[in-house]
A protein has these predicted regions:
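Hydrophobic alpha-helical membrane segments
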Residues: 1-201
């Protein structure tokens, strides 16, 4: 099992060390989300470059562009699945949020749990996709699921902390808002690396 504190400490240390490089990258990522079409590929590229940073490998704009071309269609496949699942869960939560009754309360709890697990899977989706040979959606999500099964508390802990950081960053200064997504990517990358090292030892 991975150690939550070790993952967060290592990711935060790397994020701080790479701050000057991360900020322009995060700004480009933010703009891409506003433009929609390049949004999912930009997220995949962010993970890919943070993986290189975690491995002490330098990267530049050419690396980012090459990654964007490689990851464009895989990223959109991932985004479409995400949109379907998250849309379904959010619709059910909003549509039945005020419906009274114990059964409906239980269903809302189930939907919230499903959403949390799904976010946990996607936190580590790209680190697994980048690390494995079989890059299909099915195989990647299977590996993400195994990760959460093998590290249930740490996995949910990493997910909760990442979600909290993103939420808090929305109400803080712009540089932290931009840099927080890079930090989340580093957390996902670091968690997967720790998991793979634990498996191999």
């Amino acid at each position: 099992m991975i150690r939550l504190t070790a993952v967060l400490f290592q990711a935060t240390r790397r994020w701080w060390y790479e701050w000057t490089a991360v900020l322009p990258l995060a700004l480009v990522w933010f703009v891409c989300q506003l433009l929609v079409l390049p949004g999912p590929p930009a997220t995949a590229v962010l993970y890919a470059l943070m993986r290189q940073s975690s491995d002490n490998q330098w990267w530049n704009g050419r690396d980012a562009w090459q990654a964007a071309k490689t990851l464009f269609w895989p990223a959109w496949k991932w985004a479409l699945v995400n949109g379907l699942v998250v849309g379904l869960v959010v619709f059910n939560l909003l549509a039945y949020w005020d419906v009274p009754g114990a059964v409906w309360t239980l269903l809302r709890v189930v939907w919230l749990l499903v959403l949390t697990i799904w976010l946990g899977l996607n936190l580590v989706y790209w680190p697994f996709w980048l690390a494995q040979t079989d890059k299909s959606l099915r195989n990647t999500y299977a590996n993400c699921g195994r990760f959460l099964l093998l590290n249930p508390l740490s996995g949910l802990g990493v997910t909760a902390v990442s979600a909290l950081v993103l939420f808090v960053s929305i109400f803080t200064i712009l540089p932290f808002v931009l840099g927080s997504m890079a930090w989340v990517a580093l957390v996902g990358v670091t968690a997967v690396q720790h998991s793979l090292l634990t498996r191999d030892t």
